[in-house]
Amino acid sequence: MPEQERKVTAKEASRKILSKLALPTRPWGQSMKQSFAFDNVGYEGGLDSTCFILQLTTGVVSILGMTCHSCVKSIEDRISSLKGIVSIKVSLEQGSATVKYVPSVLNLQQICLQIEDMGFEASAAEGKAASWPSRSSPAQEAVVKLRVEGMTCQSCVSSIEGKIRKLQGVVRVKVSLSNQEAVITYQPYLIQPEDLRDHICDMGFEAAIKNRTAPLRLGPIDINKLESTNLKRAAVPPIQNSNHLETPGHQQNHLATLPLRIDGMHCKSCVLNIEGNIGQLPGVQNIHVSLENKTAQVQYDSSCITPLFLQTAIEALPPGYFKVSLPDGLEKESGSSSVPSLGSSQRQQEPGPCRTAVLTITGIPRDSSVQPMEDMLSQMKGVQQIDISLAEGTGAVLYDPSVVSSDELRTAVEDMGFEVSVNPENITTNRVSSGNSVPQAVGDSPGSVQNMASDTRGLLTHQGPGYLSDSPPSPGGTASQKCFVQIKGMTCASCVSNIERSLQRHAGILSVLVALMSGKAEVKYDPEVIQSPRIAQLIEDLGFEAAIMEDNTVSEGDIELIITGMTCASCVHNIESKLTRTNGITYASVALATSKAHVKFDPEIIGPRDIIKVIEEIGFHASLAHRNPNAHHLDHKTEIKQWKKSFLCSLVFGIPVMGLMIYMLIPSSKPHETMVLDHNIIPGLSVLNLIFFILCTFVQFLGGWYFYVQAYKSLRHKSANMDVLIVLATTIAYAYSLVILVVAIAEKAEKSPVTFFDTPPMLFVFIALGRWLEHVAKSKTSEALAKLMSLQATEATVVTLGEDNLILREEQVPMELVQRGDIIKVVPGGKFPVDGKVLEGNTMADESLITGEAMPVTKKPGSIVIAGSINAHGSVLIKATHVGNDTTLAQIVKLVEEAQMSKAPIQQLADRFSGYFVPFIIIISTLTLVVWIIIGFVDFGIVQKYFPSPSKHISQTEVIIRFAFQTSITVLCIACPCSLGLATPTAVMVGTGVAAQNGVLIKGGKPLEMAHKIKTVMFDKTGTITHGVPRVMRFLLLVDVATLSLRKVLAVVGTAEASSEHPLGVAVTKYCKEELGTETLGYSTDFQAVPGCGISCKVSNVESILAHRGPTAHPIGVGNPPIGEGTGPQTFSVLIGNREWMRRNGLTISSDISDAMTDHEMKGQTAILVAIDGVLCGMIAIADAVKPEAALASITLKSMGVDVALITGDNRKTARAIATQVGINKVFAEVLPSHKVAKVQELQNKGKKVAMVGDGVNDSPALAQADVGIAIGTGTDVAIDAADVVLIRNDLLDVVASIHLSKRTVRRIRVNLVLALIYNMVGIPIAAGVFMPIGIVLQPWMGSAAASSVSVVLSSLQLKCYRKPDLERYEAQAHGRMKPLSASQVSVHVGMDDRRRDSPRATPWDQVSYVSQVSLSSLTSDRLSRHGGMAEDGGDKWSLLLSDRDEEQCI
């Protein structure tokens, strides 16, 4: 067909189809070459390149053997993937398949063969084929993007384009040299992406598939004819093309936004289907579909497309069940090109009205910040946006009046200490639209509300720090992107909240999720508004180090499922194909034999429960395959069992051998020949040798079997260790002894020869014992990890919420099936199953596993919760943010594992020595053999002199060989490794026994040998330096004793606090009972506890307590109370709490009382007030007291040349206060478990040996990483198992004792080795016959290992005389040096910051700020500063694991 005729035909066809679809046409004269549907992939598309004639054929295949729809699905999936197949439809009822295919690529017979390969019978049905010419269209095309590496110039680009363009099925190809990629449009029934990739690889380049676009399918709408029109080319140019002739203003005149209601969508695939297909229609500029709202926003050119056309196109999309509703006023219009304007389209989406209130605020200091006020208001329900101007003293609040009122907003601000008034004339009604407009109050000042509008462009309303914004981007924008940022410098959850809250205020940030332990932030953002480098800069502006991570892929989920109901291979194929087509699943493999499926997925898109649901929807049953939780841990049960068996077997037969050896050493007045055991049973065989032979044989082949196995493995790797030396010595000794004994019996010798049967039992007994104990110690590793994992909850209560957060359904879900984004209910006393954020409810959480602090932390909506922590009080709903291996607890487990794996074993000195000793002895033995043979043949008289022939029938040569061999074997046996092998284990066994007697449990020889090298000891604070529980330090009576006695106050306060579960309340109750000398208290009613403030109740029946006078001392400075006060029963109204609690109840706190509280708070103590019957009558100072021996231990370690440091998760000021009392100069405060590990590694990298002393779960990674981990005996099981040394008596002076004992033990080991070496150095030359000329020859007793072994054992037993230095000795050594340090003498490092935080002089404002920071065990005080910004900043840096700002923990 001529080119001109072809264009005319296309034009006429396009006009016909457009007239049917009410699509307005435009003159061809305005046309110019533009691209359609492919502009977004980087190349132009034109009519000439998209349409060509193609011959298609439809055939019918008869199929026998199909039994279910799974078979139908398998056949359709298999055949549709073949080249040349356009479509296939299989009918189970008719037993046939209708296939549309390209006959030039394959025929019907080949299709039948493919079906038969699947196990079915297939044949072509006659007379049912039809063929017709077809034009290629986008409905039959797909796009793939390939990564091409190796291109260097434009010639490479031309070569690839030229070759790929010639391939059958390739429609277009565009190669980019700068991007190193190729974008190819192809026909999937003719060629596949893998073929395209292979063709490029064959040309010498490296190619990989990046992504592919699904074929475009629009059902009855003829996209090919739509493409044939040039209306889009003429009227609606793509936004990316800057060369278009129309001006931007002209183009905007035709753009409109249409809101549509779409029913029938059920998953993300529907969204992608609509967006992908409709977005490529002529005139459609942009489309955004919301699955949650069931709406779509379409931006289109009203001059070339109509709303009716869009409705028809969407409803025609497969599978054909979409139902589109046009806005009011448009349903009845047909063919009209007029569409609602942007503003009118937005009004269709408007929800209920919102209001903007302008507040006038007075009392804000100029040097303060409005951030705390904004945070407080943003957390109120119904508040949508806040903008407060510090300069003008005004604030604009956008709120929903149906949820919150303006009076409530005013009251909330007034509660912060400011004066507020609401301007009624400025309260205006607004509607929150889905467009780009921002609500604005009438009459607002430019400095307030307009700033709010600018801060919220892009419709990013501020939802508060606890809100996770997962909403899609605005309709007018592009798809959101995600970046991952590595953040350094975070020390607590307050830092996390600070980063999340600050980033969410910026335009373009859609959601922020920060992980504290991994130091990583996941940020979703709108790339048109903000870019990832700017996000990193925003984080750095907050004072952290931030860097964009190159690998932006999220951690991939991996599960194994058990699937039942599969019967054949087609079932497997059906499941795999269904899973791989599911969005979010990256890999699926199903095994029919094992009925298991291995699935990898993106946890952000899909979860395990969703995957199981997908499988069950296609008719199968799936469940999670439970894996052994401890499968990855080292299991030493087998090794322990085998070495225990080896030791016991060697011991049973070795004890008699040792007895016989001692018997041989007993001096006797008679010659040895006359001894009973020396008598021959038969000629050449004595009683002693017979017993030795029997016992040694059992030991050699039963007890020594595992030594042979280890020696074989060592020799196979071409190395010689202690096992090789032991096996070599015992085997040669046994074989030599057996041979000479048999020879003596054969020759009927009068005297039984000297044998070495005593060597193997001695060696095997002690070495097997050492190996057994070694593997028992190693097994503790897996126990520590198992106990760590046991902290995790096994199930989670996942709930489904309805309107107003009403719980519609609860479901108990195994932890493995909990997904990110799940809403989880946690009841009081339960464990938080995952990391998350509180959605609803208030509670207190015990987070000691991460902070080490025993004080519970207040949790409210928006607060971060940690997996494994315990919910102490209220029931809460949380949203899961980190699950599986991303939780904080999993990160701690990972830290412990890495520390244990990286901790190189300390090689025994004897093992190192044996590597040289073994070959040396073999060489000496061989030289001895050769030298004596040479000497014998040169001068036989020398041999005959020292080795008289037992028989005259033996030849001269035989005598020489026997003598030379005997001396050679004697050298091997006298060089006994027994003494070397016993040198270390005997000293270690005695040393550990002595340590246990002195209250120190040392796990094996490695920590005992290493402790003497320690140069730095790092102490944890809570529970290690301190007792770990709060104690009352001072009880100050604020009223006259005559008015209210101390005993009465103690009785009332003790009774009130007896109803409290808070640790501070328990401490107060305990103190009151001790002071009153009683265990019974009065009664309390109307008890109320307000988290973060205090308690209130009514107390009665305390008269009986006052009548009882216990023998107890009163606090210093308080006189004896008067007797006989009040005879009748009284009821007291009691308030106990912080300053704010007293203010709320109308009590005034004088400056003297406030100063007294501040003095205690400056010391790291918590001060609370007591009011009885409306009168402020007492102040209680509570603190976690320092252990009395802590300062002495610190001074003693320093005197030994050991550096001492304090490392704690508590805030810097509490840590500094403790350090000054103990005498520690260097402090690391506000550190995480990972920081503790990093600090230990940092010191180890400097060549120092580090000991870590701790007691909590959060210390366990550092305990495992340290060269010697020392745990407090009263600490957690996890810490005890992870440590190398346990202080049973909870005495810090035992740290000094363990180092002292280690030095003694190592010194004894060295003495033992010297004794063993001396024995060998003297014995080997004698055994070799070097001193024969001077008459020194090998005597029988020297063949026994007892000479060296006994000396080594006796040397080790001298350790039993060790005595631990007593307290008086330590105090005498530290006399005159136990002085508290000043604050300036203590250097504090915060988190991973190596910069010293010196102690500045306290200004009046610092004292005020300090009150709101310092606390007991990460508790903060109650003084609410009116200078909100500075208090907030301080809280972010100093508070630990608090939600958004400093929160006070009170009784």
Curated annotation (Swiss-Prot):
Bilayer topology annotation: Multi-pass membrane protein
GO molecular function, one term: ATP hydrolysis activity
Organism taxonomic ancestry: Eukaryota, Metazoa, Chordata, Craniata, Vertebrata
Enzyme Commission code: 7.2.2.8
Family per similarity comment: Belongs to the cation transport ATPase (P-type) (TC 3.A.3) family. Type IB subfamily.
One Pfam family here: HMA
Binding locations of Mg(2+): D1255, D1259
Organism: Rattus norvegicus
Keywords attached to this entry: ATP-binding, Biological rhythms, Copper, Copper transport, Endosome, Golgi apparatus, Ion transport, Magnesium, Membrane, Metal-binding, Nucleotide-binding, Phosphoprotein, Repeat, Translocase, Transmembrane, Transmembrane helix, Transport
InterPro entries listed in its UniProt record: ATPase_P-typ_cyto_dom_N, ATPase_P-typ_P_site, ATPase_P-typ_TM_dom_sf, ATPase_P-typ_transduc_dom_A_sf, HAD-like_sf, HAD_sf, Heavy-metal-associated_CS, HMA_Cu_ion-bd
Coiled-coil boundaries: none
Extracellular compartment residues: 669-690, 739-757, 936-965, 1329-1339
Name assigned to this protein: Copper-transporting ATPase 2
Free-text tissue specificity from the UniProt record: Expressed in brain, liver, kidney, spleen and stomach. In brain, detected in neuronal cells of the hippocampal formation, olfactory bulbs, cerebellum, cerebral cortex and nuclei in the brainstem. Isoform PINA is expressed during night in adult pineal gland (pinealocytes) and retina. Isoform PINA is not detected in other tissue.
Catalytic activity: Cu(+)(in) + ATP + H2O = Cu(+)(out) + ADP + phosphate + H(+)
Active-site residue numbers: D1020
CDD domains in UniProt: HMA, P-type_ATPase_Cu-like
Region (Disordered): 328-353
